[in-house]
Amino acid sequence: MNQMKDTILLAGLGLIGGSIALAIKKNHPGKRIIGIDISDEQAVAALKLGVIDDRADSFISGVKEAATVIIATPVEQTLVMLEELAHSGIEHELLITDVGSTKQKVVDYADQVLPSRYQFVGGHPMAGSHKSGVAAAKEFLFENAFYILTPGQKTDKQAVEQLKNLLKGTNAHFVEMSPEEHDGVTSVISHFPHIVAASLVHQTHHSENLYPLVKRFAAGGFRDITRIASSSPAMWRDILLHNKDKILDRFDEWIREIDKIRTYVEQEDAENLFRYFKTAKDYRDGLPLRQKGAIPAFYDLYVDVPDHPGVISEITAILAAERISITNIRIIETREDINGILRISFQSDDDRKRAEQCIEARAEYETFYAD
């Protein structure tokens, strides 16, 4: 029975599930994690990398061995698995959680179909990466990130505390809220911004016939502010459909906002135009800089360097000597409102700060942030 108590079934062996597993292993080395994934390649990799200890033959066969179930799959598949659990006939108690980006539909369904001996705590670790797959999993992925917990109507407080203890190796900041509040907050700061980014890209694409140079000049700041439009189309289709009501509310607000600024422009209302941008600037400048949020952060450093051969290799050699890893490096051709022509992206703010100090000390180039 003790073996079952210390066994966790992880369904979904991608970046998020794999990172949770590594964090649990770090803090609870006695736990046994068995895994299952729709991709045999991911399951084999997870076992080889030590992310899991064993593979399950099926979802339900894995649940039969475990006391805790972590469902790290898209929301649609999570709902399918909850239904399988409801009809499994498994008699022992279970602690169940998920990692989905929307919570109301999942938590409501869990309340509806699961027996009381199965305690479900909705979960949403608000951190990610620009990489995917179990090979990109890191035990520190959620460090200092918000990890939202959304208990259901039938969830005991003890189950929430039990889950927090299991996940404390993530070093995340746990925040409890209702599923409805979660979906409202994320619709504002994550879901709707993805729609806006995608719509800006569509607008640019449609403008190419009229302005053929649009694509070339969009390589600078425009590309930066629309980065999130490169996210998984399938994932964002599902997120919007599962958070439909909140998203429709955001559309209504956005239409009112656009109508307002359009009126200011139409009427050449300089005072209100200034106030509009000043209010936005002040609010954005007051947002936390170092707290991880719902959208993966980009830790970019801009380096003002002369345009001559060998500059990029000089910079990368400095960083390599200090063992500072970079995720991307590129030259910015369109530099309106951006200081510097070389942009280097890092995995963390600490790496960016170290790089800034090294470059300014050893190469005497001026560096800037555009946060």
From Swiss-Prot:
Q: Where is the ACT domain?
A: 300-371
Its pathway, per UniProt, is: Amino-acid biosynthesis; L-tyrosine biosynthesis; (4-hydroxyphenyl)pyruvate from prephenate (NAD(+) route): step 1/1
What broad class of enzyme is this? oxidoreductase
Q: Which residues bind NAD(+)?
A: 7-37
Please state the Enzyme Commission number of this protein. Answer: 1.3.1.12
The organism's place on the tree of life at top rank: Bacteria
The record's CDD domains line, in alphabetical order, gives:
ACT_PDH-BS
Which cysteines are cross-linked by disulfides? none
What InterPro entries does UniProt report for this protein, alphabetically? Answer: 6-PGluconate_DH-like_C_sf, ACT-like_dom_sf, ACT_dom, NAD(P)-bd_dom_sf, PDH_C, PDH_N, Preph/Arog_dehydrog, Prephen_DH
Q: Which GO terms describe its biological process?
A: tyrosine biosynthetic process
Q: Name one GO molecular function term.
A: NAD+ binding
Query: The Prephenate/arogenate dehydrogenase domain covers which part of the protein?
Result: 6-295
Q: Which reaction does it catalyse?
A: prephenate + NAD(+) = 3-(4-hydroxyphenyl)pyruvate + CO2 + NADH
Keyword annotations: Amino-acid biosynthesis, Aromatic amino acid biosynthesis, NAD, Oxidoreductase, Tyrosine biosynthesis
Quote the SUPFAM superfamilies the UniProt record gives: 6-phosphogluconate dehydrogenase C-terminal domain-like, ACT-like, NAD(P)-binding Rossmann-fold domains
Q: Which family does it belong to?
A: Belongs to the prephenate/arogenate dehydrogenase family.
Which PANTHER family does this one have?
A: PREPHENATE DEHYDROGENASE, PREPHENATE DEHYDROGENASE [NADP(+)]
Indicate what this protein is called per its UniProt record: Prephenate dehydrogenase
Which gene specifies this protein's sequence? tyrA
